[in-house]
Amino acid sequence: MSRLLKLGQNIKHYRKLKNLSQNELAEIVNFSREHLTCVETGKEYTSLRKLFLIADTLEISVKQLVDFD
């Protein structure tokens, strides 16, 4: 499994733990829902700045998002 796909799966996992829809998270971090879908499915990259915003919104560390073990 690629690291990009694992990152996306981690975002999706923690988003669901917070009971946030893709639309809700995308709005908070100023993404389109389509871009968030692509990030969560490993089809697109996002910036480090956006990863920090996602982590802050989900109340986790960036390390948790990029933990690939």
Residue ranges and their predicted role:
Residues 30-44:
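Recognition helix of helix-turn-helix/homeodomain-like DNA-binding domains
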Residues 1-6:
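A detector for short, charged/polar N-terminal pre-domain segments
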Residues 9-28, 53:
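Short basic helix-loop element that most often maps to the first helix and adjoining turn
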Residues 11, 25-26, 36-39, 65:
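Conserved hydrophobic/aromatic packing and binding residues within compact polymer-binding modules
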Residues 59-69:
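Short C-terminal boundary/hinge segments that cap the last helix of small helical domains
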Residues 43-53:
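Short, basic-rich loop-to-helix N-cap that marks the start of a DNA-contacting helix
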